[in-house]
């Protein structure tokens, strides 16, 4: 393998010639060959956007040669566009400040910008990773800034659109099935009737609440640490740098980014990310409930509840011919569990800051962005391959309503709780219908039963 010599404050080190990274990235690859998790692509893109904004602002403030700034910006644009995916190989499991990933970006942009200026990589380059690309910055403020940018952009452009689409599908199903009377269930036991549309409307409301809660967290994610530099004081950064870079990032992404009012907090803790992920966890809990309900309602096809049918997408068993499983529901429940686990890790990371810096940053953003991707992709898949194809099995629904003992609840206002309970118990013990049991006990007439026990009237859907 052909190499070139790169140097940092520890001295020279050989770097593969074909790569744009430099000495500090190479050292990180050597010392942190841990597991397979790499820095998430959205974080890399956010860091490149930040470096682009910083170069532009530094040039405007007279802190950086305009030609050098332009080359850095062009190099950063290439990274954002996905041109150099193999240049960011570092493990999540590295320094807790993300310093090595910040330097990975600085080195790649410095070498690429040097090439764009007609120079070369390595010692003879025209752009320096620290003096130029990292001008007015520290890993301690750039990495948390990139964390917030990546988190906000991914939530706004992935999670919320997927949530809205699934919500729309379920709302349409709720409206279409609003007059289908079915038996309700509490404690996994028969309860009073409702309509299938009413039941699904509960799912829609869950998603509405989740969206409201997620949107309420965005203001915190929009506050950026940039300008705090090493410990929050802003040492070596131009006084206008923070506000201008935040405004540039807002313009670049379309998100409402602003400079965080207190940089000490922005470096030392991650409440905004904890709060936001808490809302994602709540969405995960709702999705788990919805997916579980759907697979129970579709259970069967001949020995389960069987009240609804869902799409049959693929064979379900390697031994049982013809078996089809609720695989989309299972995928959603698994990813929801993973998001809940991620929340625990993020909470531990968020609680583990010391003095002026939290050093669990890579852990926090790795888990956050994994949750975002799981939720967004999971909702898109569940919507397309399951929810859109939900159909009622009307005959089965009617059969279960007519067999339910809990219709007896409609008699409470007319004959009282105790007599109604006698009817239900007699019907259950002797395998009678409610009507047969009621007439046998003499608590009401056939006409009264027909007038008082009307499942549709018990749902309030017709009022």
Swiss-Prot record:
Substrate binds at residues 97-99, 125, 128-131, 138-140, 186, 318, 323-325. Transmembrane segments: none annotated. The record marks 330 as: Important for catalytic activity. Residues 121-142 are annotated as: Disordered. GO terms for biological process: fumarate metabolic process; malate metabolic process; tricarboxylic acid cycle. Residues 121-134 have a biased composition (Basic and acidic residues). CDD domains: Fumarase_classII (cd01362). Pfam families: FumaraseC_C (PF10415), Lyase_1 (PF00206). It is an enzyme of class 4 (lyase). GO terms for molecular function: fumarate hydratase activity. One of its GO terms (cellular component) is cytoplasm. Its EC number is 4.2.1.2. Keywords: Cytoplasm, Lyase, Tricarboxylic acid cycle. InterPro entries: Fum_hydII, Fumarase/histidase_N, Fumarase_C_C, Fumarate_lyase_CS, Fumarate_lyase_fam, Fumarate_lyase_N, L-Aspartase-like. Pathway: Carbohydrate metabolism; tricarboxylic acid cycle; (S)-malate from fumarate: step 1/1. There are 2 substrate-binding sites: the catalytic A site, and the non-catalytic B site that may play a role in the transfer of substrate or product between the active site and the solvent. Alternatively, the B site may bind allosteric effectors. Involved in the TCA cycle. Catalyzes the stereospecific interconversion of fumarate to L-malate. Homotetramer. This is Fumarate hydratase class II.
């Amino acid at each position: 393998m052909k190499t070139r010599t790169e140097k940092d404050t520890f001295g020279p080190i050989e770097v593969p010639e074909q790569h744009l990274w430099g000495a500090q990235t190479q050292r990180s690859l050597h010392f942190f060959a841990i597991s397979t998790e790499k820095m998430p692509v959205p974080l890399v893109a956010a860091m490149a956007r930040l470096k682009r904004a910083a170069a532009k602002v530094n040039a405007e403030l007279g802190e950086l040669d305009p030609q050098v700034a332009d080359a850095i910006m062009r190099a950063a644009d290439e990274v954002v566009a996905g041109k150099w995916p193999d240049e960011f190989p570092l493990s999540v499991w590295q320094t807790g400040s993300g310093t090595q990933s910040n330097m990975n970006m600085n080195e790649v942009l410095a070498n690429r910008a040097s090439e764009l200026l007609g120079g070369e990589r390595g010692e003879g380059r025209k752009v320096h990773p620290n003096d130029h690309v990292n001008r007015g910055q520290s890993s301690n403020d750039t990495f948390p800034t990139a964390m917030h940018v990546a988190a906000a952009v991914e939530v706004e452009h992935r999670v919320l659109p997927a949530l809205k689409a699934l919500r729309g599908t379920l709302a349409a199903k709720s409206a279409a099935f609003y007059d289908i009377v079915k038996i309700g269930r509490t404690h996994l036991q028969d309860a009073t009737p409702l309509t299938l549309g009413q039941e699904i409307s509960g799912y829609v409301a869950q998603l509405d609440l989740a969206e409201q809660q997620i949107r309420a967290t965005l203001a915190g994610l929009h506050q950026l640490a940039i300008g705090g530099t090493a410990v929050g004081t802003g040492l070596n950064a131009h006084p206008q740098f923070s506000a201008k870079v935040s405004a540039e990032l807002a313009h670049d992404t379309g998100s409402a980014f602003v400079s965080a009012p207190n940089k000490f907090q922005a470096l030392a803790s991650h409440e905004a990310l904890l709060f936001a992920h808490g809302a994602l966890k709540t969405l995960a809990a709702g999705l788990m409930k919805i997916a579980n309900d759907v697979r129970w309602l579709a259970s069967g096809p001949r020995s389960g509840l069987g009240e609804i049918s869902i799409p049959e997408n693929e064979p379900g068993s390697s031994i049982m011919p013809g078996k089809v499983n609720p695989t989309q529901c299972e995928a959603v429940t698994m990813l929801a569990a993973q998001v809940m686990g991620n929340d625990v890790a993020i909470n531990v990371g968020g609680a583990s800051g010391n003095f002026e810096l939290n050093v669990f940053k890579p852990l926090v953003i790795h888990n956050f962005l994994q949750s975002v991707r799981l939720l967004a992709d999971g909702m898109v898949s569940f919507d397309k391959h399951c929810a859109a194809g939900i159909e009622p099995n009307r005959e089965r629904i009617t059969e279960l309503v007519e067999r339910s003992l809990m219709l007896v609840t409609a008699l409470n206002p007319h004959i009282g709780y105790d007599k109604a309970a006698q009817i239900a118990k007699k019907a259950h013990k002797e395998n009678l219908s409610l009507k047969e049991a009621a007439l046998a006990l003499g608590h009401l007439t056939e006409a009264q039963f027909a007038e008082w026990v009307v499942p549709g009237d018990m749902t309030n859907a017709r009022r």
